[in-house]
Amino acid sequence: MADSKSFKEKQYAFAAHIRDPEHVAPPDGIESRRMAIYRGLFFNNLSSLLATFFPVLRKIHSDAQWRGFIRGFMQHHQAETPYFLQLPQEFLAYLQTEFDAADDDYPFLLELAHYEYAELELAVSDDENEIQGIDPNGDLLTGVPAMSSLARAFAYRYAVHRISPKFLPEEPEAQPV
């Protein structure tokens, strides 16, 4: 039992250091070179994974800004899932509830992150449309419209669907988008 507890404590110390190497010392007994490899692998893999899920958010930020987002996520957010496809939801939750925005952060940051998360969620959804009772050859003008199971209604203050490195609005739209 003591060995099991000791191993678990070492795992917690290892994970705590990986998440916040600037403030948490590495566990005893692990060579610093090896620890640096683990730190780099974890950080770079998470950064790359989240950049894939939030491509526009990544493109409009410098490397230093992006590293700050990832490091803050690692330090402050207790992710509840081991699944890669659920990490974007965790990252969005971090941005919405724990992220401390700086004065120079884009005013549309949260809306853009939500939009990109919604795109991903719809892209990987396995929801199927209920087509029972729908005539695929029916008259579109006299028939009753059928809503896709993937239809979502969102309203954003910024034109998040247009944001890119070449379009970075400073003011919200006159009407919700």
Residue ranges and their predicted role:
Residues P21-A25, H61-A64, F99-A101:
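Short helix-capping/linker segments at secondary-structure and domain boundaries
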Residues F7, Q11, F54, D63-R67, ...:
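Alpha-helix initiation and N-capping motif
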Residues F14, F69-M74, F91:
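Short alpha-helical scaffolding segments that buttress acidic/His motifs in well-ordered protein cores
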Residues P21-V24, E31-R34, L57, L85, ...:
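Generic detector of short, locally flexible boundary/turn motifs and exposed helical patches
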Residues G29-G72:
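Glycine/small-residue-rich interface belts in oligomeric ring/scaffold proteins
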Residues Q75-V177:
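Hydrophobic packing positions characteristic
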